[in-house]
Amino acid sequence: MAASSRAQVLDLYRAMMRESKHFSAYNYRMYAVRRIRDAFRENKNVKDPVEIQALVNKAKRDLEIIRRQVHIGQLYSTDKLIIENQEKPRT
């Protein structure tokens, strides 16, 4: 993978992770983070530039979907789940 492609993929990964953490619903947030990690790990060994570009284009479309869904989720937010209200253990 060319250096510019690698940088573009890493930037896209970071943007998707950052945006998915804005989901107000815990289940959506955790699902999005898990799905993004799994998808990028699954495709980390792809070497074909054409396939890489196709995956980058798909990820860009998915990022826009995440942004839209985050916005919609913020408009129609619900109460937090019990698991979200728990304090983190002190170490």
From Swiss-Prot:
Subcellular location(s) per record: Mitochondrion; Nucleus
GO CC annotation, single: mitochondrial [2Fe-2S] assembly complex
UniProt main location, coarse: mitochondrion
Record InterPro entries: Complex1_LYR_dom, Complex1_LYR_LYRM4, ISC_assembly_LYR
N6-succinyllysine found at: 47
Pathway where it operates: Cofactor biosynthesis; iron-sulfur cluster biosynthesis
Name of the featured protein: LYR motif-containing protein 4
